[in-house]
Amino acid sequence: MGITPTALEKTDKHTLVNLQEEFNKTKIQEVLDDLNQELIGLKPVKNRIREIAALLLVDRLRQKVGLSSSNPGLHMSFTGPPGTGKTTVATKMADILYKLNYIKKGHLVTVTRDDLVGQYIGHTAPKTKEVLKKAMGGVLFIDEAYYLYKPDNERDYGSEAIEILLQVMENQREDLVIIFAGYKEKMDKFYASNPGLASRVANHVDFPEYRPEELLKIAEMMLQEQQYQLTKEAELVFLDYIKKRMLQPHFANARSVRNAIDRARMRHANRIFNLSSKIVTKSNLTTIQAEDILKSRLFNT
Ligand SMILES: Nc1ncnc2c1ncn2[C@@H]1O[C@H](COP(=O)(O)OP(=O)(O)OP(=O)(O)O)[C@@H](O)[C@H]1O
């Protein structure tokens, strides 16, 4: 079709070389490796982020060699229960977008409804615009985004904030990426009530709830970072603790695990402090024992 096989081959070869070079240049692999190392589990999320990164990279490359670019939508939706790594992954996503030159600064600004919506007439627009100003050049992460929309209250100022966000999403695509986050079911309802907004959110990532064994691994990783470890017995007790905690109200996955660890460290310190011998070994200082966890009120009920 006008192109000789040799010419086509040459172009193909040329493009292939560019892809590899471009990929190396962006240092995206480092971000993906960090993501892999820092977060336990989350396989589907990690795969999805890799897919999005690949799409964005290929699109950049197509632009470079003069091919049509589909102009990929950059706004995203991260759904899942609290403490499942949405904010952590959003930080990495911001870095990827920055490295691919889609945004100029690459920082993450995390907000909730209260940061965007005022309580009185005339307060919402300046509040939302102030947040947008801070987030320009980076990623705006709106946690529990569905609280922006209150269908029962016609005069709620949340819709004013949504209007402003919509304008920015459409007109300043070069400067700002928005990630809407929250529970899946509530987000689905939010999108259904705001089709204009939904149509501008191109990438959806769903964060699954962690299994107890994954939460134990997360705990062990967090402890290791702080140079602590669990005894074998403490491991089993902690797993038991997690299973009990999951059934309690306000359970927030890895965040609840982090809080539990903080409390276990407190009890550990107390135990060490009360030891009859005031000479302690390094192992005393680093080892969390079963009793440090068993003293949690969860085991007294
Ligand atoms: N898979 C994981 N491996 C290791 N640490 C994790 C993992 N998931 C979450 N964490 C840690 O748990 C804490 C909470 O995670 P993060 O804030 O990213 O969750 P979130 O889904 O954004 O929660 P929320 O929506 O409630 O703000 C962070 O300290 C994070 O490092």
From Swiss-Prot:
GO function term, MF aspect, one: ATP binding
Record's keyword terms, sorted: ATP-binding, Chloroplast, Nucleotide-binding, Plastid
Cellular compartment(s): Plastid, Chloroplast
Gene Ontology CC terms, in alphabetical order: chloroplast
InterPro entries: AAA+_ATPase, AAA_lid_6, ATPase_AAA_core, CbxX/CfqX_mono, CbxX/CfxQ, CbxX/CfxQ_RuBisCO_ESX, P-loop_NTPase
Binding site for ATP: G80, P81, P82, G83, T84, G85, K86, T87
Statement: the UniProt record of this protein carries the keyword Cell membrane: no
Signal sequence residues: none
Domain of life the protein comes from: Eukaryota
Protein family per UniProt: Belongs to the CbxX/CfxQ family.
Functional description taken from the UniProt entry: Necessary for the expression of RuBisCO.
Protein name: Protein CfxQ homolog
Species whose genome carries this gene: Cyanidium caldarium (Red alga)
